[in-house]
C-alpha cells in the first residue's frame, strides 16, 4: 500500500480500524500525552484529536504507536517485510561488482528504479495554499503539546528540519525537537554531530555573520518522515529513498523565502533563519530516557513565514520512559538494521535493540562463532559500522543457539558463558548521548561489551560444558501421550 500524503495514510488507517477520531475537547497540555501513552501501551490506534482545547487545528498522535503501523507507513504489510528494505539498503551501501553479464543485467533494474525516483520539483503545492508572513506569524496558532509536568513549555517534536551546507550538493533532513519561546522563535536542539548542525557550522565558516536558511516541514507523508530516521546510505537522498518506499517520486516545492525544497504535500511549513550567535537555554524536557534532560544552549530559529494546507493537521508525539513512539520505531527499524549488519558481518544471525534500552542504548547480537576473539571483533564492529550505534552503551554477543529477543535465554548465556573479568570489554572516553546524565562528562563516556559466547581453546584452558539436549524420541513419545496423562 502506497500513500501520497499524510491524509491518505490517515484515511487508510481509518479504513483498517487503526485510527480513532476524538471529538471531545482535549488539551495539548498534558492531557494528550496521558491519552496517547495509555493507548500506545495497549497497542491501540493512531489518534486524531479533532477539537484541541483552544485551537482550530486537529492534532494527530500515536501515529507510529505499533511496529505494524511503522511497517505500513514504509509500504510493507508486515514488520518482517522490513528485512527486504534492509537488504536493499545494504546493497546500496556497498554494491558488489557484477560477477558477469547476467548478474549485471539482473542488477540493472534496481539502479534504474533508484534513478527514476529522483525527487520531482513542482511549482504549485498544497503546503503553500495559505501563506502567513511578517508580523502575522504566530506559532501560538499551532496546538503544540506540553507533554510532561516538568516541561518548561510547548515542544515541537515531529518537525522535519531541512538544511543545506554551502559545500554540499544535497539537502539534509533531520528530526530535531524545537522549544517554542516566542511568537516567531523556537530553539533548534540539534547535536553537534547531526547533519543540520554540521551544515550550520560550515555556513558560519564560509559566510560569517550571515543568517542561515532553515525550513521545517510538519505533517509530511509517512515515507518521507520514516526515511529521515532510516540508515540511508550517503549515495542516496532521503527524498529518493522515500520515493522508493512510496512507489512514486517525492514531490518537492521551493520555499517562498529561501531556496530550500520541502515536501509539497506536507501539512505545515515553517520558513526562517538562524542568526549566528543567537542562542538560548533549552529545556528541561522529559525525554525518551524517562528523565528530564539538563538545560543546554542551542541556536534560535526565527520563523519568518508559515505556509500550510487549507485546514491543516498538526502531527505530534511525546517522548518518555519506554515504551514510547521512538522505542516502537526502534523495534520496527531493528528489522532494517539486521541485513545491513549481516552484509558487513555475515556471521551475525540476529541483532536486537530491546525497547527497554531506550531504543539504542543496548544491543544483543547472536552469531556463528568461528575463532577465538571473534565475539569481540563483532562487538567492536557494531559500535563502528553504523553511526546509529555510536551511542550504544552495551553490546551483548551470544552464540546462535540463543534467542536474542528472549531475556531468559540472554541472561542464561551471560551467567553461564561469561567470566566477568575475561569476557567484559570496557572502552573509555567514547561518544555518548548528550541526554545520558550517567556519563561523567556530557557527550563523553564509556561502553561495555559482554562476550556471552562459548569459549574456544585459547580463550580458556578448561573443558567447556556441553549443553543439555533432550532425547527427541522421548520428547515425541511424551507429546503423543500428554493429553492422556491429564496433567493440564
Swiss-Prot record:
> Cellular location of this protein?
Cell membrane
Q: Which cofactor does it need?
A: prenylated FMN; Mn(2+)
Q: Which residues participate in prenylated FMN binding?
A: 175-177, 189-191, 194-195
- Tell me one GO biological process term: ubiquinone biosynthetic process
The first-level EC class reads lyase
Molecular function, one GO term: metal ion binding
Record membrane topology: Peripheral membrane protein
**According to its UniProt record, which protein family does this protein belong to?**
Belongs to the UbiD family.
Query: How is this protein named in the record?
Result: 3-octaprenyl-4-hydroxybenzoate carboxy-lyase
Species of origin reads Pseudomonas fluorescens (strain SBW25)
Amino acid at each position: 500500500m502506497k500513500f501520497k500524503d499524510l491524509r491518505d495514510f490517515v484515511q487508510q488507517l481509518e479504513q483498517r480500524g487503526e485510527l480513532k477520531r476524538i471529538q471531545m475537547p482535549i488539551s495539548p497540555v498534558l492531557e494528550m500525552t496521558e491519552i496517547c501513552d495509555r493507548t500506545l501501551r495497549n497497542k491501540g490506534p493512531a489518534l486524531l484529536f479533532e477539537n484541541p482545547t483552544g485551537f482550530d487545528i486537529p492534532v494527530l498522535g500515536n501515529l507510529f504507536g505499533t511496529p505494524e503501523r511503522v511497517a505500513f507507513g514504509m509500504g510493507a504489510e508486515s514488520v518482517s517485510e522490513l528485512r527486504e528494505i534492509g537488504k536493499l539498503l545494504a546493497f546500496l551501501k556497498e554494491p558488489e561488482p557484477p560477477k558477469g553479464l547476467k548478474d549485471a543485467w539482473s542488477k540493472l533494474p534496481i539502479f534504474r528504479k533508484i534513478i527514476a525516483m529522483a525527487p520531482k520539483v513542482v511549482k504549485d503545492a498544497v503546503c503553500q495554499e495559505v501563506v502567513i508572513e511578517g508580523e502575522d506569524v504566530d506559532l501560538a496558532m499551532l496546538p503544540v503539546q506540553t507533554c510532561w509536568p516538568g516541561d518548561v513549555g510547548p515542544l515541537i517534536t515531529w518537525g522535519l528540519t531541512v538544511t543545506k551546507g554551502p559545500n554540499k550538493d544535497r539537502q539534509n533532513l533531520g528530526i530535531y525537537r524545537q522549544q517554542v519561546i516566542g511568537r516567531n522563535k523556537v530553539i533548534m536542539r540539534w547535536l553537534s554531530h547531526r547533519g543540520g548542525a554540521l551544515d550550520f557550522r560550515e555556513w558560519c565558516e564560509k559566510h560569517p555573520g550571515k543568517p542561515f536558511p532553515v525550513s521545517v516541514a510538519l505533517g509530511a507523508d509517512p515515507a518521507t518522515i520514516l526515511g529521515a530516521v532510516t540508515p540511508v546510505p550517503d549515495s542516496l537522498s532521503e527524498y529518493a529513498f522515500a520515493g522508493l518506499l512510496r512507489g512514486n517520486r517525492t514531490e518537492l516545492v521551493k520555499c517562498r523565502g529561501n531556496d530550500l525544497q520541502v515536501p509539497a504535500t506536507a501539512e505545515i511549513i515553517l520558513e526562517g533563519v538562524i542568526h549566528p550567535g543567537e542562542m538560548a537555554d533549552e529545556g528541561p524536557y522529559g525525554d525518551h530516557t524517562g528523565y528530564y534532560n539538563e538545560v543546554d544552549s542551542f541556536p534560535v530559529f526565527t520563523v519568518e513565514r508559515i505556509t500550510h494546507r487549507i485546514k491543516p493537521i498538526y502531527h505530534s508525539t511525546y517522548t518518555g520512559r519506554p515504551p514510547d513512539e521512538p522505542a516502537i520505531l526502534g523495534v520496527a527499524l531493528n528489522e532494517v538494521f539486521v541485513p545491513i549488519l549481516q552484509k558487513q558481518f555475515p556471521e551475525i544471525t540476529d541483532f536486537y535493540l530491546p525497547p527497554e534500552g531506550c531504543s539504542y542504548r543496548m544491543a544483543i547480537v547472536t552469531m556463528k562463532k568461528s575463532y577465538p576473539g571473534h565475539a569481540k571483533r563483532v562487538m567492536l564492529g557494531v559500535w563502528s559500522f553504523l553511526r546509529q550505534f555510536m551511542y550504544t552503551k552495551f553490546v551483548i554477543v551470544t552464540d546462535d543457539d540463543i534467542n536474542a529477543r528472549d531475556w531468559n535465554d540472554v541472561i542464561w548465556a551471560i551467567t553461564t558463558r561469561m567470566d566477568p573479568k575475561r569476557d567484559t570489554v570496557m572502552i573509555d572516553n567514547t561518544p555518548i548521548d548528550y541526554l545520558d546524565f550517567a556519563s561523567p562528562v556530557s557527550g563523553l563516556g564509556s561502553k561495555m561489551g559482554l562476550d556471552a559466547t562459548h569459549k574456544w581453546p585459547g580463550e580458556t584452558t578448561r573443558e567447556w560444558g556441553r549443553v543439555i539436549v533432550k532425547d527427541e524420541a522421548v520428547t515425541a513419545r511424551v507429546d503423543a501421550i500428554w493429553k492422556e496423562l491429564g496433567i493440564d
